[in-house]
Amino acid sequence: MANKGNKKRRQFSLEEKMKVVGAVDSGKRKGDVAKEFGITPSTLSTFLKDRTKFEEKVREASVGPQRKRMRSALYDDIDKAVFAWFQEIHAKNILVTGSVIRKKALNLANMLGYDNFQASVGWLNRFRDRHGIALKAVCREDSDRLMNGLGIDKINEWHAGEIIKLIADYSPDDIFNADETGVFFQLLPQHTLAAKGDHCRGGKKAKQRLTALFCCNASGTEKMRPLIVGRSASPHCLKNIHSLPCDYRANQWAWMTRDLFNEWLMQVDARMKRAERRILLLIDNCSAHNMLPHLERIQVGYLPSNCTAVLQPLNLGIIHTMKVLYQSHLLKQILLKLNSSEDQEEVDIKQAIDMIAAAWWSVKPSTVVKCWQKAGIVPMEFAECDTESAASEPDIAIEKLWHTVAIATCVPNEVNFQDFVTADDDLIISQDTDIIQDMVAGENTSEAGSEDEGEVSLPEQPKVTITEAISSVQKLRQFLSTCVDIPDAIFGQLNGIDEYLMKRVTQTLIDSKITDFLQTK
């Protein structure tokens, strides 16, 4: 007698299972769906019970849609980390070979703390099978192209094609570029040579660095509020500080992370929604800029890989000008200290934030427009302001300032002002830590450093009352009245500050009088 139990069991791929679930969701009767797909009612019930698991696999794209078994890898967290990295590389249209994937797997395994993991050919084959990845051989020509960058032909092709389509529906006022830079905020002129070329992945210098995100539009009419990332979430110098000229966040590396960038993006998107605007945001494809959230008012355009040095406006002089202005602020502070009896103190985070923000807002619209034109992203006719050279910012006065401070602080003769400005250009601003952060269960690797970690210990500043602030403005006004050729704009700004303070103090007095009146009733 034939054994009826020998009927071959059918296996369904993830894609087929989702189709079954989708059929039930569409309103079809379960019995009809079971007949349509040739499955038993119990199998259908199992599919429906496991739908959350299927949806999670689809959302994470951690299993190829044609794969029928969903057994996890032996080193599941390594597998997920490598696949997350692969998705980022694939999104950048970068070709990778099996050997590259194996090397990356070993690197990520080491970051996750695995010493015995072996990225063998067998592991690679199983990894490819799990995720439905088809690797193609990379010919010598492709390899050379990847190693040498896209080349001038690819850049010209981007200028003539993709960027024209991207900017077609936007005016220069609504085309933005965002980018990050590292800042050694406590760098002194005499330490320039020691800092230059330091990537600062960790160690003592990591406590002396910040990462700053800047964003501006192509017309030079709008610069967004900077985002500064430090190591300490609650530095002592920010105690009782409720208003800053920038947004401040923290993690243990003082790097830009995916979560921080996405938070910033969502805030900008909400602001554009309130203003009923739509903007184009051009960014590079570093690891912190991948896996973006849903945006309603921002269209994101990625600059071609390996070309940001010639295509990213902020990299073509805008950030450099900001650093020139920041370092000039720092030099003035040093000179004032040298000219007084006060001890030379290192800059704290609050002072650095104030100087970075002041430098950013001081970058001229003409400098911004010049750099956008240099990138070739907007036509020349869009520029309606004086496009003076961006290199004109470090003028004679700043060079004299540098020379004076350099002599007083014994700076080596071979170090010049440009060395001082560019000493932190090689700082890392993001890394694969986003991937590792997602993999490590129960350990938040983006956690900010402890309070005051690495911070300069300065005396706590006394809280200034509003009456003292008003008195200070009056003293400043008195001082300016004794000077010659003070621009009208200075008096206008002073009047604005005075008006704001008087409005606050009068409102406080009015509120207190009303409270007193109500309490007597």
Curated annotation (Swiss-Prot):
Protein's UniProt keywords contain DNA-binding = yes
Q: What does the UniProt keyword field contain?
A: DNA-binding, Nucleus
Entry's Gene Ontology molecular function annotations: DNA binding
**What positions does the domain HTH psq-type occupy?**
3-54
Boundaries of each DDE-1 domain copy?
170-372
Cellular localization per UniProt = Nucleus
| Sequence ranges assigned to domain HTH CENPB-type in this UniProt record | 66-137
Q: Which residues bind DNA?
A: 30-50, 99-130
Q: Which SUPFAM superfamilies match?
A: Homeodomain-like
* One GO CC term on file: nucleus
Which superkingdom, per the lineage? Eukaryota
Return any one Pfam family short name.
HTH_Tnp_Tc5
What's this protein's family per the entry? Belongs to the tigger transposable element derived protein family.
Q: What is this protein called?
A: Tigger transposable element-derived protein 6
- Taxonomic path: Eukaryota, Metazoa, Chordata, Craniata, Vertebrata
